[in-house]
């Protein structure tokens, strides 16, 4: 689907304010006249809060913790869907087969998580792979990819472009801990096998999607 955009949004967007979320809605409505949109939402603070509660009351199973994260991401997806309907399919997509059918009939499909043990980064890459899309736009909590955590290391080097192989090497050295870790190895594996480019841009700058569509690079390009 050459006219399809796959867009991943960090859950941190939903921890901010309604005005920023509204800006995304306006952009998606504008783009839907020219493109089909597959949007993947993270769980954000809601997921962290409820996973924290679950642990405090004795839940230790990763399955249940992951399910709480998935449902949190789907609630964020519902927020977007409610503001994008009827352009958007009226509920979060549950699997890739369903997504393929929906994209034939709707301009916009929104997903949270899909299955336990899978990050939203991996979901975004699987969506792109299933739809035959060669690029994922990733609204992240960071402005660029760095060789190490820029909040801890003032000499951290930013990348305008970085290969999947190089980024995998950095991730395996565990130099991107905690909040800074922007993508997981499984997502990179999917991107590599299907030759998908990932473009990182900051979630507080929603208009950068127009720069990306003009061929500009507002953040970091992760290439196969």
UniProtKB/Swiss-Prot annotation:
Keywords: ATP-binding, Cytoplasm, Kinase, Nucleotide-binding, Pyrimidine biosynthesis, Transferase
Its EC number(s): 2.7.4.22
Gene (name only): pyrH
Entry keyword annotation includes ATP-binding: yes
UniProt family annotation: Belongs to the UMP kinase family.
Main location: cytoplasm
Species in which this protein is naturally found: Staphylothermus marinus (strain ATCC 43588 / DSM 3639 / JCM 9404 / F1)
Catalytic activity: UMP + ATP = UDP + ADP
Annotated protein name in UniProt: Uridylate kinase
């Amino acid at each position: 689907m050459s006219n399809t955009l796959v867009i991943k949004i960090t859950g941190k967007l939903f921890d901010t304010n309604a005005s920023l979320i509204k800006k995304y809605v306006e952009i998606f409505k504008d783009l839907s006249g020219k493109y089909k949109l597959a949007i993947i939402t993270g769980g954000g603070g809601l997921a962290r809060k409820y996973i924290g509660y679950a642990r405090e009351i004795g839940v230790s199973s990763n399955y249940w913790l992951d399910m709480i994260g998935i449902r949190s991401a789907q609630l964020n997806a519902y927020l977007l869907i409610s503001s994008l309907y009827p352009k958007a399919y009226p509920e979060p997509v549950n699997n890739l087969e369903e997504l393929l059918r929906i994209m034939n009939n709707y301009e916009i499909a929104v997903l949270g998580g899909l299955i336990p043990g899978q990050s939203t980064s991996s979901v975004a890459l699987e969506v792109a792979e299933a739809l035959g899309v060669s690029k994922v736009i990733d609204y992240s909590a960071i402005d660029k990819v760095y060789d190490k955590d820029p909040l801890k290391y003032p000499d951290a080097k930013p990348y305008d472009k970085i290969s999947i192989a190089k980024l995998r090497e950095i991730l395996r050295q565990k130099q991107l801990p905690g909040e800074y870790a922007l993508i997981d190895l499984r997502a990179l594996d999917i991107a590599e096998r299907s030759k998908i480019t990932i473009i990182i841009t900051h979630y507080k700058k929603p208009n950068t999607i127009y720069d990306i569509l003009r061929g500009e690079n507002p953040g970091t390009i992760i290439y196969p």
